[in-house]
Curated annotation (Swiss-Prot):
Claim: Coiled coil is one of the keywords in the record: no
Catalytic activity: GTP + H2O = GDP + phosphate + H(+)
Alphabetical list of CDD domains matching this protein: EF_Tu, EFTU_II, EFTU_III
Keyword Magnesium appears in the UniProt entry: yes
The protein's name: Elongation factor Tu 1
Protein location: Cytoplasm
Region listing for G1, in residue ranges: 19-26
Residue intervals of the tr-type G domain: 10-206
């Protein structure tokens, strides 16, 4: 069976459903595929197909995730839905399924619940840019005032975590009715309205090639008569021959000029996001640069040692620790291409962290790393991954 060719006619956006267990995330996911398949083509996916999500391994962590796709008038959406709460936590922290925006599903019959709050917090910590809200199961609420009350609660909760609670679109409906083909206001029209809200409110993400140039350095070579070459995969932006670049991290930041770019042993005028390149650097000795540093556009990223992070600690079954860790824990933090030792400070009132938990922590590294909010890392002990994290706030 030949695979269908992916036609890129519309801009592509990654989204996902978040919210409390049994509030209707998977039913909404199924309804989105069905209603939009009818409107714009594509495949409808049944609840069972989505609910029995296959397990995937991302950075050594097992996550169950369902991937569906659908199209609106103007966009192509890839949508992730997770069966269990733990899968959401892992997914958001590891960035296994990057989200350009989230659909927060809240049952109108129950209002916001503990996981509603936790998912909003996670979305804030890992830097999800936008949220739209679907007040589900609204057919079970007869009282219009009650619906308004739940909407107010959700907006306040979003504002508590620095989202724009006053202006975030809130769409009211019933995913189940929509899935059953009901054409009343709560049914299919509510799904269309939700997608219009997503089109309008979730911003188009910047393409990697449009960002400031950044390349994590993987290897360093000395080529006699030519100088020093650093190799790696360009993470974002473009590097042109003759441009100034900085080497950031581990030691003091150094400025140099890129005098050559090569790929597959051929010389190029430039390298761009996604390319595996070698960059020839002027006046840099082999010992001036090492794996773990980054090559970047000058002044675009800075080195830091002290930061706050949201971390998921692998369970014993995932090959993680068998025992908890405490304040002052000193593992290695693996950023991009290298390990740096760091000391963990737990939040006040948290005595210890058990395998399988997620926790907010502060980390002090022994050497600086080129860092920005949203940077992902692994926590390792002797080369074995015991946790995954994301930088939520740089301190210094």
């Amino acid at each position: 069976m030949s695979k269908e060719k992916f036609e890129r006619k519309k801009p592509h956006i990654n989204v996902g459903t978040i919210g409390h267990v049994d509030h209707g995330k998977t039913t909404l996911t199924a309804a989105l595929t069905k209603v939009l398949a009818e409107a714009h083509g594509g495949d409808a996916r049944a609840f069972d197909q989505i609910d029995n999500a296959p397990e995937e391994r991302a950075r050594g962590i097992t996550i169950a995730t369902a991937h569906v796709e659908y199209e609106s008038e103007s966009r192509h959406y890839a949508h992730v839905d997770c069966p269990g709460h733990a899968d959401y936590v892992k997914n958001m922290i590891t960035g296994a399924a990057q989200m350009d925006g989230s659909i927060l599903v809240v049952s109108a019959a129950d209002g916001p619940m503990p996981q509603t709050r936790e998912h909003i917090l996670l979305a804030r910590q890992v830097g999800v840019p936008a949220i739209v809200v679907f007040l589900n199961k609204a057919d079970m609420v007869d009282d219009a005032e009650l619906l308004e009350l739940v909407e107010m609660e959700v907006r306040e909760l979003l504002s508590d975590y620095d989202f724009d609670g006053d202006n975030i679109p809130v769409v009211t409906g019933s995913a189940l009715k929509a899935l059953e083909g009901d054409d009343s206001e709560m049914g299919r029209p509510a799904i269309i309205k939700l997608v219009e809200a997503m089109d309008a409110h979730i911003p188009q993400p910047e393409r990697p090639v449009d960002g400031d140039f950044l390349m994590p350095i993987e290897d360093v070579f000395s080529i006699s008569g030519r100088g020093t070459v650093v190799t790696g995969r360009v993470e974002r932006g473009v590097i042109k021959v003759g441009e100034e670049v900085e080497i950031v991290g581990i030691t003091d930041t150094r400025k140099t000029t890129c005098t050559g770019v090569e790929m597959f042993r051929k010389l190029l005028d430039q390298g761009e996001a996604g390319d595996n390149i070698g960059a020839l650097l002027r006046g840099i000795k082999r010992d001036d640069v090492e794996r773990g540093q980054v090559l970047c556009k000058p002044k675009s990223i800075t080195p830091h040692t002290h930061f706050e992070a949201e971390v998921y600690v692998l369970s014993k079954d995932e090959g993680g620790r068998h025992t908890p860790f405490f304040n002052g824990y000193r593992p290695q933090f693996y950023f991009r291409t290298t390990d740096v030792t760091g000391t963990v400070t737990l939040p006040e009132g948290t005595e210890m962290v058990m395998p399988g938990d997620n926790v907010k922590m502060t980390v002090q590294l022994i050497a600086p790393i080129a860092m920005e909010d949203g940077l992902r890392f692994a926590i390792r002990e002797g080369g074995r991954t015991v946790g995954a994290g994301v930088v939520s706030k740089i301190i210094e």
